[in-house]
A protein has these predicted regions:
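Transmembrane helix-loop junction
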Residues: 9, 43, 47, 100, ...
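Loop-to-transmembrane helix boundary motifs in multi-pass membrane proteins
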Residues: 10-20, 254-271
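Membrane-interface starts of transmembrane alpha-helices
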Residues: 14-18, 52-59, 222, 226, ...
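Helix-loop-helix module between adjacent transmembrane segments
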Residues: 1-68, 141-145, 237-246
Length: 272
């Protein structure tokens, strides 16, 4: 059962209006969402291996499409577990090592970040200006909306019983808090760690999208000569991209093949 189908059954949508609207929303917006994940994969290969962006984009999309369509929901869930583990290890270890090279305490870390603003770590400021109510609402919608995303909810719909459902809810929230907190830590530590590259404005100077990649390369190439370990952590970034893209692709394809097809078939029967 897909999420639009659940809503249709729950609210007795005999005319399939709710089914059609929810399916259309998923297909349109998840195609864009999936495209952004695939674009991130292309940028990763382009930054690490120097492969042409469009070629890298095609390779990443092909790999994800193959195992998603061949294995379906089971393949996506299995690979997501492995990919999530790799991502968590990378998020934990890389900033800790980088922090060790920058400083030993948080205050000196901020001092070495090269930011003069007193509101750098304030939740109520965006740069030097206070955030507006619209920005607060937008940020809350972005964060809280994660819990209602279709590619997340289908995991809960597949759980065996109510007891496991409650346990899974706790695990999911803890995972979100840990991963998003570590993502913020990477940004703060990465700015201080890569400050010489940023100030030098060299060809390899990191953009905001490649800070984590540059942290891994700088640590395991220039600081610690363990390129194999660095490669594994870069795989953690790839795992994050793939685990998002395959889940969204599965939800999108399910909406097309099950929900939209069901509406079209019913329309054809009425005409006949």
């Amino acid at each position: 059962m897909t999420l639009p189908e659940f809503f249709g059954n729950r609210y007795h949508d005999e005319k399939k209006i709710l089914l059609g609207i929810s399916s259309a929303i998923i297909v349109v917006f998840f195609l864009v969402y999936t495209a952004s994940a695939l674009a991130s994969g292309g940028k990763l290969f382009n930054t690490v291996f120097g492969i042409d962006y469009h070629v890298a984009l095609f390779i990443g999309a092909a790999v994800i499409l193959i195992y998603t369509f061949m294995g379906g929901f089971l393949a996506v869930c299995t690979t997501d577990f492995v990919q999530g583990t790799m991502m968590l290890i990378a998020l934990l270890i890389v900033p800790i090592i980088a922090w060790g090279y920058v400083s030993g305490d948080f205050s000196s870390l901020l001092a070495q970040s090269g930011v003069n603003s007193e509101h750098y770590m304030s939740l109520m400021y965006n740069g030097d200006h206070a955030i507006t109510p619209i920005e607060i609402i937008s940020n809350l919608a972005w964060g809280l909306g994660y819990c209602g995303m279709p590619h997340i909810l289908i995991r809960f719909m597949a759980i065996k019983n109510e007891k496991e459902l409650r346990k899974s809810s706790v695990i999911a929230i803890v995972w979100v808090v840990i991963s998003l907190t570590l993502a913020v830590v990477i940004g703060v530590v990465g700015r201080a760690y890569l400050l010489p590259m940023i100030l030098g404005e060299t060809a390899g100077a990191p953009s905001t999208e490649s800070v984590f990649i540059q942290m891994i390369q700088e640590t395991f190439t220039n600081k610690i000569n363990l390129p194999f370990i660095g490669g594994l952590f870069i795989c953690g970034i790839l795992a994050a991209i793939m685990s998002t893209a395959d889940s969204q692709l599965l939800v999108c394809s399910s909406s097309v093949s099950a929900d939209i097809y069901q509406i079209g078939r019913a329309s054809c029967r009425e005409r006949v």
